[in-house]
């Protein structure tokens, strides 16, 4: 039998990291067991669902490299089918019409609150006669359709992450609402728990992997599966992603959407790698940098922890920096060129861009760090006080003059790393000047301070862009 997993997001907001991790776990397990990863858009909330959010979800999945199989199923296309199953449940006596008003429900909740009881519907219309139903309808009252839940029943299943889970019918909040706003003898608008069961059955889903906040929904849905004689899938409930305070990560924690992570400069490979370890602890490896394919080979739902997983910026940043360091210079230069273009910076040549990418990548945590790391190679930096103080020393100023004179005398010299070292050594021996003084003086001329990237590699780049002499001359004018 073909194994089939699915992601079923609601397009009511931007693609969130919690949904993205659920997608990742489903995709990884589908790859591991040779199954399919399917996508269903649950867009039946016509007020909050928006096409731009659907587009955002699809783009986010593609960016993360999580390719889905088969055509996308839109839940809104299946409303008539959902209604037909609610009708079946009505006809077999598993569901009924309830005309309780919002005011009556509010009064009931207030009464329960005053008594210290949890909120729970009292199922007051479970046994209405046909005449009573007709009377409510003739008065123009709308109804909801509720699914009967036996309070004495025990629902249990074996969760692939949490083991056996038991739930009592009396703890499910009363009879479950399947649809709302039913006028007359109509069915109304089908709701989540019914639609999910019907659509998962239609898609032949064998494994449902979702967040632990759905555990109570699973108990309710199992009862609907059984009432409709549908085959139960295997359920797995992943831990929540937590903030530093141990609370569920939310929009109040600032960055939560995949768009925001991308715009901040995180690589999709790095974010996927990090998300996989948010709650997953593989027994077969201690490695922390793994590609999606490598993870899928060892991924197992049983290795996912039950406890919530704390989100760590420090860890994500480290993983992202590792991916940047190990990226091919050609690919990295193509990516960071976009940042250069945004700032109006033009690389003298493709080879020059590759060399600069190699030079700065070890100092980068985020892709956007390329802006600050590259800036001194495109714009002349202001000389900082530490640089000014250093060059006020006569030896330092004289050392810089020696380098400038040498470069002017050797007009049109083709400078590479070896030649740069040779120049430093030659001037040092010829004029009895310490190499350290020469190099620090040159660093101030290039970067305006005593710190910066590798000097020799930088000099090669400044020489290729024909800016090394002009920077040294500019340095003399400013001191």
From Swiss-Prot:
Family, per the entry?
A: Belongs to the class-I aminoacyl-tRNA synthetase family. Glutamate--tRNA ligase type 1 subfamily.
Its annotated function is as follows:
Catalyzes the attachment of glutamate to tRNA(Glu) in a two-step reaction: glutamate is first activated by ATP to form Glu-AMP and then transferred to the acceptor end of tRNA(Glu).
The answer on whether this UniProt entry bears the keyword Nucleotide-binding reads yes
What is the predominant subcellular site recorded for this chain?
cytoplasm
- Reported EC number(s) for this entry are 6.1.1.17
Give the GO molecular function terms.
ATP binding; glutamate-tRNA ligase activity; tRNA binding; zinc ion binding
The cellular location(s) given in this protein's UniProt record come to: Cytoplasm
Record protein name field: Glutamate--tRNA ligase
Q: Kindly state the positions of the motif 'HIGH' region in this protein.
A: 9-19
Where on this chain does ATP bind? 251
Superkingdom, taxonomy of origin: Bacteria
**What's one GO-annotated cellular component?**
cytosol
Q: Does the keyword Protein biosynthesis apply?
A: yes
Listed A to Z, the keywords are: Aminoacyl-tRNA synthetase, ATP-binding, Cytoplasm, Ligase, Nucleotide-binding, Protein biosynthesis
Principal EC category: ligase
The record, for Pfam families, names: Anticodon_2, tRNA-synt_1c
Query: What does the annotation say about its assembly with partners?
Result: Monomer.
């Amino acid at each position: 039998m073909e194994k089939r997993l699915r992601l079923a997001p609601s397009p009511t907001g931007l693609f969130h990291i919690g949904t993205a991790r659920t997608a990742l776990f489903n995709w990884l397990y589908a790859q591991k067991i040779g199954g399919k990863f399917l996508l269903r858009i649950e867009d039946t909330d016509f007020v909050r669902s928006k096409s731009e959010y659907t587009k955002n979800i699809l783009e986010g999945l593609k960016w993360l490299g999580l390719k889905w199989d088969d055509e996308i199923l839109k839940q809104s296309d299946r409303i008539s089918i959902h209604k037909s199953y609610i009708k079946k449940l009505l006809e077999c006596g598993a569901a009924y019409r309830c005309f309780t008003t919002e005011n009556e429900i509010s009064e009931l909740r207030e009464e329960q609150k005053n008594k210290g009881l949890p909120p729970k519907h009292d199922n007051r219309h479970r046994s209405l006669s046909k005449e009573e139903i007709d009377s409510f309808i003739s008065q123009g009252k709308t109804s909801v359709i509720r699914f009967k839940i036996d309070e004495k029943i025990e629902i249990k299943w074996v969760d692939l992450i949490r083991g056996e889970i038991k739930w009592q019918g009396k703890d499910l909040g009363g009879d479950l609402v399947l649809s709302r706003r039913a006028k007359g003898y109509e069915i109304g608008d089908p709701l989540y728990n019914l639609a999910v069961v019907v659509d998962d059955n239609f898609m032949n889903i064998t494994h449902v992997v979702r967040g632990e906040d759905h555990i109570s929904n699973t108990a309710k849905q199992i009862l609907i599966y059984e009432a409709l004689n549908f085959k139960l899938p295997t359920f797995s409930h992943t831990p929540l992603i937590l903030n530093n305070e141990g609370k569920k990560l939310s929009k109040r924690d600032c960055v939560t959407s995949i768009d925001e992570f991308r715009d901040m400069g995180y690589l999709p490979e790095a974010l996927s790698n990090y998300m996989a370890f948010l709650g997953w602890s593989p027994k077969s490896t201690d490695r922390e940098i793994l590609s999606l394919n490598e993870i899928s080979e060892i991924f197992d739902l049983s290795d996912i922890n039950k406890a919530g997983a704390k989100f760590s910026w420090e860890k994500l940043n480290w993983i992202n920096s590792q991916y940047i360091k190990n990226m091919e210079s050609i690919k990295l230069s193509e990516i960071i060129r976009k940042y250069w273009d945004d700032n109006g910076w033009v690389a003298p040549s493709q080879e020059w861009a590759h060399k600069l990418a190699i030079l700065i990548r070890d100092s980068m945590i985020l892709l956007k760090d390329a802006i600050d790391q590259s800036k001194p190679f495109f714009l002349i930096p202001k000389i900082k006080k530490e640089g000014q103080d250093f060059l006020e020393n006569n030896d330092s100023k004289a050392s810089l003059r020696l380098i400038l004179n040498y470069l002017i005398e050797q007009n049109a010299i083709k400078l590479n790393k070896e030649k740069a070292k040779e120049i430093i050594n030659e001037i040092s021996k010829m004029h009895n000047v310490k190499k350290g003084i020469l190099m620090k003086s040159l660093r101030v001329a290039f970067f305006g301070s005593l710190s910066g990237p590798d000097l020799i590699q930088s000099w090669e780049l400044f020489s290729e862009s024909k800016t090394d002499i002009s920077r040294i001359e500019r340095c003399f004018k400013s001191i």
